[in-house]
Each structure stands twice: as structure tokens, then as C-alpha cells.
Amino acid sequence: MLYMAIMIPAIITVLMDNRQPAKTMAWILVLAFMPFVGIIFYIFFGQNTRKERLISDRSMDQLTKRSMLEFAEQENLHIPANNKPLMNLFTNQNWAFPFKDNQVDIFTDGYEFIFSLLYNIGKAKHHVHLDTYIFEDDALGYLVADALIDKAEQGVEVRLIYDDVGCWKVKDSFFERMREAGIDVHSFMPVRFPAFTSKVNYRNHRKICVIDGRVGFIGGMNIAKRYVKGTGKQKWRDTHLRMEGGGVYALQRAFLIDWYFVDRTLVSNRKYYPPVDSKIRNNCLVQVVTSSPIAPWPDIMQGYVRILLQAQKYVYMETPYFLPTEPVLFAMRTAALAGVDIRLLMPRHSDARMVEWASRSYLMEAIEAGVKVYLYTGGFNHSKLLVSDDNLCTVGSTNVDFRSFENNFEANAFFYDEEMAQRIKRIYLKDESSSILVDDVAYFVRRPFLKRLFESIVRLHSPLL
């Protein structure tokens, strides 16, 4: 009786989510064959949060239309016709408005990024807004923390959001020291018993910094020593951007929405959206697109699918982890079969063994359709970028995996500009020159049967990795 009392409501809950039939059946089977363990798994990893409204439409309206758009001056936008549907997709669903007049620096190693971040924090006059997944209490973390504390003691507004799970191993005293110095610090969706439920699976993976509303950072680098020094014998390769211009408005909005999420304070004022420097005048268009498990649609994933299916010549992608959702893998295979040059570059060895094992069966499917897979041998490549047809590119925090597309809070900058696309393309090709091409499925098939069987079993857990 106890079994039935638990199972029937659980199965009804799964059915009422109205997901894809395959996913619904998978969860029903888990609940049926592992009743008690299955329920725990479902609570942690299976709940559908897209129906939750953790931020009201009214608050979103105030944080967007009545703040950013009120101060943003956008005239004579020259929108490329071939990318207009993609831009409309992001604008209609995500309120990710395009901004022109952007100046961008690209960092491909941690030294450059941290130096620039510290330099710009040091120049801050009004505010520093930092949103990061990992903020470790190592030597580098203390360096950044000290810079933030110095600014707070000078009277500069400093707001910090760190992810509670990403910083699980960091001592509370590290952040308390910043609070005592006057920094407004919040952990994102803290995981505490008895609230230890699905929150553990939905994390803020964004890496955003905005300084005085004039300078912004976005990309794949967290605040930790390994992003500079590497791990063990492996060098660390990553991509991060520094932006000035109209796109900083969008980065500011992304941060302030997260701030409302953690602090329930609507921050909206002209001083957070200062006029763009008159020296920056170009048609480098950018949309800062965010995605989250509470949004109605998986916006960044839809953007990747759209790019893959609209490409005429090529799509080059870099990701540290490859556990693609069905729509993304299908789009990659479809584009490759249509003759588009689809290339995927990822590390030869991952920093997460389970992810590496699970990814191999997906790589086999991609290669069978003609996708060129490159395994990076110059260290651990943590970069998340995409470039297509010499006119479109994106850099951000999003991996090509279930977790980024479905579960995490992510942020990417999408650029519609030939010069920017060429710069990202050159970075990709340089990484490709330090990689080995795997264009034959036999590379994976030659491995022992039991090893391939194990990898296929691990693949079943891809949404959880």
C-alpha cells in the first residue's frame, strides 16, 4: 500500500508534465523499477521547471522596457537579412535586443583575462557587478576579492553573485570577509536541507562582469587559479570577451535580472546605463542571450539549431563537453549530410571522465553523418564558441550538452559582424592546428566491446552529467 501511495502520485506528476513521450516513458520506467531510488532521482533531476514563474512578467518588463530600453539609443540598425530570423527568435522569446557600436577584445588565456579584469575593476568609479559560477578561495580568488574589497572601501557599489554549488568547497569566511567590507554578496539558489531538492541540478553557470555600465566581460572563464595555471600537466585554453559599447547594456540587464532573482531588489536607474562612448561607432551588432530552466523555451539551444540549419558554407564549434540534446545532434547531422562543413573541436581528454565516456557514442553518430571531429591536444580546451559563414559567431558560457541547454542558467553573446566572425574563426583554426582529426568511426569501434558497452550505458545518464 505504501508503495502504491508513493508511486501513483509520482507517475501522475510525470505524465502531467507533457514532455516528449520518450523522456516521459524513461522516467516512468525508472520509477517503476527503482521505486524509492527513482523518486529521489526524479526530485533531484527530473522536475520540469519551465512552468515555474520565479520572476514575474511585470518585473521583467521593469528590468527591460522601463530601464534598459528607456536609456538605450538605437538608430540606423543595419540588420543582415540572412540572420534576421535568428535575431527575431532571440528578440521575441528572450527580449535579447540587438545593440550596435561595440568594441571587443578577445582573450584566449587566463593571464590576459585576469589582468584586464583587475585593471578595469581598479578603474571603477560607480559600480562593479560580478556574476560567476566559480569563485575559489585560492591565490587568484583572493587577488580578485582584494580588488573588490578595495573598491567597496572607496565607496564604489560592488555586487557579487556566486553559484552555491559551483562554490561548494569554498569556505563561508571567504565571502563573509567581502560582506564585512561592504560588498553586497549573494549565493545563487543556495542548496540547504530541507530545500535540498532539484535546486542542486539547476545552477547559474554564467560568467558576467559589468563595470560602471561601460565595460563588460562575458565568456567561459571563472575566478580560479586553474584558469591561469592549468591543471597538473595540462595547460588551460579558454575564450572570454571584454566589451565596450551598446552590448554592455544587455550584459547589465542580464546581471540585474539575476540580482533581482537573488535579492528581490529592482535595480533600475540611468546611472547603470550611461551613454555609449561617442568614439565607438560601428555596425558590430550583438545580442546577449540568456537561457534558464525557468524560461518558456531553451533559447540558446534553439539558436544553435537555427544556425546549423541556416548555414550555407560552414559551422565551426568548440565545446569542452559533447553530450548534445537530440535537436542539436539532429541539426548537426542534417547540416553535414546537406554538404555544410560542420566541425566540432573538443579536448582529447576531459576533466570529467564520465562525460568523456558518455560523449564517445555521440561522436560516433556525428562522424557517421560527415561531421569532422577534432580532438585538442594542446591542453584542456574549456572554450565555448561557434562561428558560421564568416558573418556570425557566439562566445559564452554554454557547453554543447544537456546541462547547459536544459538545466543551467547560461549567457552567450551572439555577434552579427564579419570582422568579429573572422577573428573567432582564426582562433578556431589555430586551435584546430593543435588537434587531431577523427573522421573515421573505426577510431571508436576498434576499442574493446565491453568498453563500448560501458560507454553506451553511461550515455543513458547524459542528462544528469
Predicted regions and their residues:
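N-terminal localization/anchoring segments of enzymes in phospholipid and broader phosphate metabolism
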Residues: 1-302, 306, 310, 350, ...
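A short glycine-/small-residue-rich loop at the edge of a beta-strand within enzyme catalytic domains
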Residues: 295, 299, 319, 323, ...
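Helical hairpin unit composed of two closely spaced alpha helices linked by a short loop
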Residues: 311-312, 321-343, 347-348, 352
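Histidine/acidic-residue-rich catalytic or RNA/ligand-binding cores of hydrolases
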Residues: 326-329, 356-358, 388, 406
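Short, solvent-exposed amphipathic alpha-helical segments in soluble enzyme
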Residues: 331-335, 361, 430
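A beta-strand-loop signature enriched in Asp, Gly, Thr, and Trp
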Residues: 338, 343-388
